[in-house]
Every structure is written in structure tokens, then in C-alpha cells.
Regions:
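Formylglycine-dependent sulfatase
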Residues: 4, 19-154
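Bacterial N-terminal signal peptides
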Residues: 7-15
Length: 154
């Protein structure tokens, strides 16, 4: 009886492990737009803006209804979003400044989970050690490099 129980337990464990390996992780996609509010997107009820692709995308994922930004400027807000820290806490305040060396970003937390992290478009975060994106595709403006004021005056 004990051998039968052990055999069944081992077989079930192996089956469970093989099923666990087949589970795929969800894709995480975050849209960030400067000067955009819920009045600007159809998925939030705008009748003036036609955003069918974003609206369709929103039906397949999570839509936030209680979100607030940490700063009224682009760079500190992006640093806050990517690090989870208030801009002052990461060293990224005021605008066009760098996060402190050693600050962990979403990239550092997602890599151990097997994710590849890309940034497409406007960057406005630095230094690269804090934001080591696997892929960066600059916007049409060619923002390949972001040089902060704090880097210039160090």
C-alpha cells in the first residue's frame, strides 16, 4: 500500500510539474502618454476622441480607474512609474535628473521572472544601470540618448 501511494504521489508530482511549466506568463504592456487624461480615450468614455485600437486593447486587459501621477513633469513621473518610488526617493526630481545608482526598476524585478523588457518611444529615464531595458526603440525624434542636467554638472 505504501509503495502504491508513493508511486501515485511521484506520478502526480511529475504531472503537476509538467503542467506548471506549460503555463505562460501574461504580457505586460503599459501605454504612457504625456498630457493625456481619461477625457482623451474612448475606453474611458470620450466622445470627442476616436481611439478604436486602444479601446480594443483595453477590453483585453486591465484598465485603471484610480491612478494619480507623482509629479507634474515627464521625467519624474516616468521614474516613479518604473521604480515604484516617489521621484524624490529615487533621486529623480526635479525634471531631467537621474535616479540614484543602485535604485531598482521594474526591469530588475521582471528579469528574474523570465521577462524581456522593452521601451518604445520617449525615454526620459536614466542612468542605464537603473533602467537596463533589453530593447529600446527611440521615437521618431531620435531620442536615443537622454542626458540629464545632473549628469552634465557632476
Amino acid at each position: 500500500m505504501n509503495r502504491l501511494f508513493l508511486s501515485v504521489s511521484v506520478a502526480l508530482s511529475a504531472t503537476t510539474c509538467s503542467f506548471a511549466q506549460q503555463i505562460t506568463q501574461p504580457n505586460l504592456v503599459l501605454f504612457i502618454a504625456d498630457d493625456c487624461s481619461y477625457y482623451d480615450l474612448g475606453c474611458y468614455g470620450s466622445v470627442d476622441s476616436k481611439t478604436p485600437n486602444i479601446d480594443n486593447f483595453a477590453t483585453q486587459g486591465v484598465r485603471f480607474t484610480q491612478a494619480y501621477q507623482a509629479a507634474p513633469m515627464s521625467s519624474p513621473t516616468r521614474h516613479n512609474l518604473y521604480t515604484g518610488l516617489w521621484p524624490v526617493g529615487s533621486g529623480a526630481y526635479p525634471n531631467h535628473t537621474c535616479a540614484d545608482q543602485g535604485t531598482l526598476s521594474v526591469v530588475h524585478h521582471l528579469h528574474p521572472l523570465g521577462y524581456k523588457v522593452a521601451l518604445i518611444g520617449k525615454k526620459h529615464v536614466a542612468p542605464k544601470s537603473v533602467f537596463p531595458f533589453d530593447l529600446y526603440v527611440p521615437s521618431e525624434k531620435g531620442e536615443l540618448h537622454f542626458i540629464s542636467y545632473s549628469e552634465i554638472y557632476r
